[in-house]
Amino acid sequence: MTATAFDAKFSARHLPTTRWLFFFIYAGIGVNLTFLNVFYISQGLTGTQVGLIGLAAASSAMLAAGFWGYLSDRTGQARLIMAGGAIAASLLALLYPLVHTFWLFLLLSVLFAFFTTSAFILIDATTLALLGDRRDEYGRYRLGGSIGYILAAASAGFVFERIGLRWMFPAYAVIMVMFALTALRLPALPIHAGGQHSRQLGAMIRQPSWIIFALCIFLVWTAMNGSINFLGITIKSMGGGDSLIGIAATMAAVAELPFMFFSGSMMRRMGMRNMLWTSMLFFTLRIGLYGFMPHPAWAIGINLLNGPSYVFMWNSAVNYANHMAPENLKATAQGLFQATTNLASMVGAVLCGWMFDQIGSANMFRVLAVSCFAAFLIFGLTRRRFQPA
């Protein structure tokens, strides 16, 4: 396809497919990634080893992010790339129950992250392309992911408590096969004319607005990575069970629903920059509270802040990256944005694994809250001076 926008009727026909794609990929997170670090600990790995696995996976995802985005921009075949990545990830997931050593877990995590990254990047780029000028309505389609996560995480904790965590892997494989089949229903994306991709890319990432954006995302996502990777382990260490982990994760997703649904109107009212800035303050509050909770059940209430923290950040950041990119580098920009989050995950995996072992989970969360507040200050001081081009 060449550089023409999708017409309204064409977009209306295909946008519901993206909602199902979000549903399946986040249902996969609900049954797998929510409990993956708990599974590692149950296999005898230490917090530092879990952190190193997270580092390796994030390194792989960071390298893959730009590759998948650039490949999609050049070929327009996001649907085939997503489907192929999902099938590969489902096959790799089935190998996890057969592995028992740290080094094999490390290798699997690298391969798994490489292929799953394609879906996370390209589903966003595809949805934004289909929305066209209505990109602020992205949240209404991403809402499918919140629903998928709620249904999966709410049931998975109770089920795994009875049948064992090993069953998360075949469950994930089935979900990702459904994702792959759904992805094949999408159209090819437009291939926008324009050479000199490298020069355009260099100009984009040298913008002061992009540099500040990437720095603040890095600081917040380093902290977010700690809460993702170690909240479940913290709940366990405080006496909670798999069901409580599932309930806490479910409440975070439930809190997303109204924010996802109304994110378009809220973004129009607040603006991308103010929404992104506000999210950093809520992340400071949310992650700081993890560091002071006296009982694991407090995680349920704290996770209600997921709406104004995670939803505000993700939806505004996806649009912010898209806004700064030229037409022929939209998927590449999403890849670079997610490469930044993966770089943060690399640092966060090692840093949080070390802090968990050395200073405990409470102090770890407090340090991470400071990182979020630093991002809030930096972005607040510069958001008006350095605006996206």
Where are the predicted features?
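Cytoplasmic helix-loop-helix junction between adjacent transmembrane helices
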Residues: 110-144
